[in-house]
Every structure is written in structure tokens, then in C-alpha cells.
Amino acid sequence: MPSRKHLANAIRALSMDGVQKANSGHPGAPMGMADIAEVLWRGHLNHNPSNPEWADRDRFVLSNGHGSMLIYSLLHLSGYELSIDDLKNFRQLHSKTPGHPEYGYAPGIETTTGPLGQGITNAVGMAMAEKALAAQFNKPGHDIVDHFTYVFMGDGCLMEGISHEACSLAGTLGLGKLIAFWDDNGISIDGHVEGWFSDDTPKRFEAYGWHVIPAVDGHNAEAINAAIEAAKADPRPTLICTKTIIGFGSPNKSGSHDCHGAPLGAEEIAAAREFLGWEHPAFEIPADVYAEWDAKAAGAEKEAAWNAKFDAYAAAYPTEAAELKRRLNGELPAEWEEKANQIIADLQANPANIASRKASQNALEAFGKMLPEFMGGSADLAPSNLTMWSGSKSLEANDFSGNYIHYGVREFGMTAIMNGIALHGGFVPYGATFLMFMEYARNAMRMAALMKVQNIQVYTHDSIGLGEDGPTHQPVEQIASLRLTPNMSTWRPCDQVESAVAWKLAIERKDGPSALIFSRQNLAQQPRSAEQVADIAKGGYILKDSDGKPELILIATGSEVELAVKAAEQLTAEGKKVRVVSMPATDTFDKQDAAYREAVLPSDVTARIAIEAGIADFWYKYVGFDGRIIGMTTFGESAPADQLFEMFGFTVENVVNTAKELLA
């Protein structure tokens, strides 16, 4: 029977070989963490390679995602549908083994990692989801939600500021089933880290309220195993500090940055094989090593045992069992569509001139009663973002049965935690901050779009309309940057009806994130027919039309729709034929068929004006070079909102004059 070291060396060999064949990659971390991975995956991780979606599996996150050959080797050796040919295709076009682990490619990859610090933060979200689902569904004698979240991370993750945001919150909330392994190898790309990373990391995590196990030999299986056992027994999140040698087994490159991010080279790989006593050719794993690694039988047994537990739970608590299944499957309640449409129709029938952030809160109030899977939150701005509703109950360390997270001032952490919650399953997460401060969270929203996961962000105070707080808080280019992100659904509604439609579609959207952008100031509700209400879901529609073919089209979003309507009324009174198009979601409008888009924006009507209190340049694709844009071309100013709108040209007079110049 092969020794533990020999089993770990299988990871080292595959990692060296994969990087060498690709002629690029990172062999150092997989070789350094192979012993830890062997102990965790063979001795502790509850998973089933035949069903990577088993609901109560332990989650494993490789936060130092550049070491991707580690997880690909583990998945292959354990029996997942990841063949040796897939490993040979590492980093090649359309392979299941991209350079960094990507969710949705290889089975068993729980999240996309690579941007350092986000993996540990996703893991915090997964652990929060586990604790919340357990609090909501477990019953005495029925622990049907009961699993750990394990994460590997390196010095780079710990240097990234997001690790502070996430790990601080994890300690505050007492996430006892979160176990992190710090790959303390003292090396980063530039060399030895003591010149730029001399923190006392164990003390840092103790200050967060974590259980810290210091100075574990990352190449000693017994020490690693004892640390994991101690971690599992402690009610706090645990940091296991594993001292490792980067590139372990490479005689001339281990312990240096030379093995971090480049192939070892044929000569050094041969020397490493000799040093490790690994006598097999590239990509060749002996049968006895495969047999020891194979987790299919044990995994199927564990899942079968859990299925029996779930059947007993379902017999005792049929309603709860059906509800848990629905939520884990990502299904909406049976009456959702009918009730949601009725709510929207009622809003249209009962006009209210309110801020769209208030309209958003009203939508939460109406929809939230149907959605126990909501997991809301805000980055310390709940009274401003209006993200709490009557059914909101805050999560606390000793009571996780609620549905609202106080993230504190942690925009980036909040957004990446929400990605983890969404990936875990069982919840529809929404979070919030001022639109200006989505900048802090941008990369996590990009990751949500890349992974195609549901992450609903409420971004309020959407323009110079927030007024006196000034340009530090007034967004200008942010809406455009969200719209330019692939697979991002971005909504800027003009009233309570469009706001409710935006919320409904964000709740229904399971294949990507949604940015819902709301105003601080009150907005007038627009009259609509039932057909127009239905057309809101198309992202852009004719809100007010001319008699006969229009000679001018005004396109507007959010707070500027009201302005466009008033300008159109004045121009119409002066004999002009003017159409107003409300376009709350440009990406959604762009997905409509050509006939619909042509019906709304006829190509032979070239006199067009776009009006939005955001960066002007975005709108050229809709108005053309012959059109006009009334938008922002500079940062804002500190002043009352009405003065700012006048100063920057968002007035009926300016729209009317611009239209007349265009039509002249």
C-alpha cells in the first residue's frame, strides 16, 4: 500500500507535468500544499465525486487559485469526471482546466478563484449560508444541514484588504464550520515576503475572534490531521497556520520564487522525480495510488446515509422538507408569477411620487413575504439604502435564523460574501451601498457576472441628485461601467412601477448578477397602459408617443424620464412630433429582437437626444454621432440637488433648446 507521502507526491507529479506541458502555470503552491491536501481530502472532506452537487457536501475553496493544478489533480485522483486528458489540456482553449479554477467548467469547482482574497471571502459566504440554512431548517434529532467549508489561502490572499473585511466578519458571526489553511511559505512573486508582509498573522486572527492553530508542519500528516480535528471541535472559525516549503520536492527551486509562476523545466522535473522517489513517466499514476485516492464508493455511501436522514426528516417535517428542496433547487414559489404581476399592476393603478429607493423598499416588502430565501444586507447604510423591510431579522452569532446581514462598512467583502452565499444555494442574496461605492466592490460583481451567479445589488443615491455630499459621493461613470460588464443586468428605474419590475426580474434571474440603481430624490410616477407595463421587462419601451411618425426621440432613464416627458409636452405643444422612450435597462433592450428594437427606435428617425445624469459618452450607440446627449462630462459639485441639475443642463429649457437646434 502506498505511503501518505507517495499519495501526496501524485499531486506533485501531476502539477509539475501539467504546468510543464502547458508551458505556463504555477507549480510551487500545489507542490507545497500537497501533504495538507492529502490529509484533508482523504481523511476529512465529505464529498461524492459521482454527485458534485450533493447538498450537504463539505465545500472546498482554493483561494490561492493560481495553484489550480492542485485542485485539478485532487478532482482527477478522487474520481470526478476530470480525465488525465483534461489535465494534459491544462490552460488550453475550451478545456475543463483553465489557468485559474472556473466555476462551471470542471465538476467539483465550487467557485472561480484567482483574484486573491476573494476565495476566502466566498468561503465566508458559504459558511454563513450553511449556518443560516441549519438554523432555519434543522430540528432536534434532524441535523440535515451540517457541513464544513474548507479553504486554502496564501500570503497574497492575506495581504489583500478583502481578507480583513471577510475574516473580521467571520469572527464576529462565529462561523465555527469555517476552517482555513494558511500556506505560510514566505514567498510571493517578488521574492521573500518579510520585506512587505511582516504581520503577526496568528495574532491578527486571534483579534478577529478566530481559533488559531500556529506553527503546524505542513509536511507532517499527523500534525495536519491533529490540527483539523482540533479545528472541527472548536465553535469558532479556525485558521490553521501551516509552515510549508513552496515547490516541495524540487531540489534546486523549492523555497524560492523561481518555482512560483513558471514551469520547473524538464531537467528540474527529472531531479524532482528522483528526489521524491516518483519513478513513473509524465501523467502516469499507478493503479494502487488511484485505488487509495478513489473517493467514489465512500462518497456514495456518505450521500446515501444523508439521503436516509433527509427521508426521516421529510416524514417528520414534510412542509419544511419540501421548502428546503425548493430553495436548494433555486425554484420560486408556485404562486410567484401571478402574485408578482398583480403587485406591479396595483402599483400602476395607485400612483405615488416617491424616491425609487423607497419604491425599492416597497417592492421588498411586497415580494419578501413570498420569499423566505431572501438574504438581505447593506454595507452599513440600511437607513439610506432602505434595504430592511418588516420581515427583516438580523443574523447574530448566537441566532442565525434571520434573513438580514449587517455587513458593516465592507462593500467589497459584502459583494464577494454574497457570491459565496449564492454559490452555496438556498438563498437569494441582495446587498446595498451608495452607487458611488460600488467601485470598492467592482471586482466581486465582475466575478458574479463571470460565474453567472445571482447577486442582487441595490445601489442608491444614483447621481448628482444626492446633492450636498458632493463629488466624492456623486456617481458619474459608474452606471456606464456596470452596463459595459458582460452578463451584468443593470436597471435604473424611473418610478415605483419600473422599480418593482426591476426587482421581479432580478429575483427571477438565476444566471447572473443584477445592479438595481435607485434615486435619493422623489420621482413622478408615469401613466402607462397594461401593454406598456408589460414592455418594461424588455428594458426599453415607448412611454409617450407622438401622433403619427415621430421627428424626434427622447431617450431617458431614472430621474431624467420625468424631465424628458415634460420637455416632450412643451415641444408637442409647439407642433413637434416627439416620442419618449424610457430605457431602464439597456442590456435587456439590446437582447430584444431586431423588429422590437426598430419599432421603439426607428432607424430612419435620426434626431435623437439621450438624457441621463451619468457619463454622456455611453449613449452614442443609441443616438449616433448626429444625435445629442445631455449627460455628465465632468465630476459633480457640492450643492443642493436642484441647483446642480440646473447647472449641468438637466432642465426642460435645455432639453427643448437642444431639440430645436437638432431639428433646425
UniProtKB/Swiss-Prot annotation:
EC id: 2.2.1.1
Gene3D superfamilies to which the protein is assigned, alphabetical: 3.40.50.920, 3.40.50.970
InterPro entries: THDP-binding, Transketo_C/PFOR_II, Transketolase-like_C_2, Transketolase-like_Pyr-bd, Transketolase_bac-like, Transketolase_BS, Transketolase_CS, Transketolase_fam
Positions of the catalytic residues: E411 (proton donor)
Cofactor annotation comment: Binds 1 Mg(2+) ion per subunit. Can also utilize other divalent metal cations, such as Ca(2+), Mn(2+) and Co(2+). Binds 1 thiamine pyrophosphate per subunit.
UniProt GO cellular component terms: cytosol
A biological process term (GO) from this entry: pentose-phosphate shunt
Superkingdom of this protein's organism: Bacteria
Catalytic activity: D-sedoheptulose 7-phosphate + D-glyceraldehyde 3-phosphate = aldehydo-D-ribose 5-phosphate + D-xylulose 5-phosphate
Enzyme class label: transferase
Record-listed substrate binding positions: H26, H260, R357, S384, H461, D469, R520
Residues that, per the record, bind Mg(2+): D155, N185, I187
CDD domains with a match to the protein in the record: TPP_PYR_DXS_TK_like (cd07033), TPP_TK (cd02012)
Stored PANTHER family: TRANSKETOLASE, TRANSKETOLASE 1-RELATED
Family: Belongs to the transketolase family.
Functional summary from the UniProt entry: Catalyzes the transfer of a two-carbon ketol group from a ketose donor to an aldose acceptor, via a covalent intermediate with the cofactor thiamine pyrophosphate.
Descriptive protein name: Transketolase 1
Organism per entry: Vibrio vulnificus (strain CMCP6)
Gene expressing this chain: tkt1
